[in-house]
Amino acid sequence: MSRTPPSRWNRLDRWMVSFMAAYGIKLLRISVAIIFIWFGALKVIGRSPVYELISRTVYWVSPEFFVPFLGVWEIVVGVGLLCRLALRLTLLLFWLQLAGTFLVLLLRPDIAFQFGNPLLLTTEGEFVIKNLVLIASGLVIGSTVERT
């Protein structure tokens, strides 16, 4: 019995899967790096749309100090991801920053949820919950750190 040649669709499918396997994690790392650098830079220059959210959540620290500090932290994470510099340390800073983003859910649920209902997110709540995607991204990126 002769084998039929793969269809164009199957060849395209194999090529796409091969491309994603070869470049997916690298592009994910670069994309997350861009997000951290961009969002961090906005905090440093005082143009972040989450300035008020941060200042209302981390109310025990002066926002004039903390927001730019957080911005520098995020830029460091972004550059570390982009250049694969001290990736273990970079990922530690990444995890600490992401853990901090969920503080609003615990400390200021009135900001994150409508009418106190955890199923009804506010815009700020959606902003925080979307960080679940960044957590998953961090897990994938972290899986590429070679053991020493």
Segments predicted by a language model, with ranges:
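Membrane-interface extramembranous regions
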Residues: 1-148
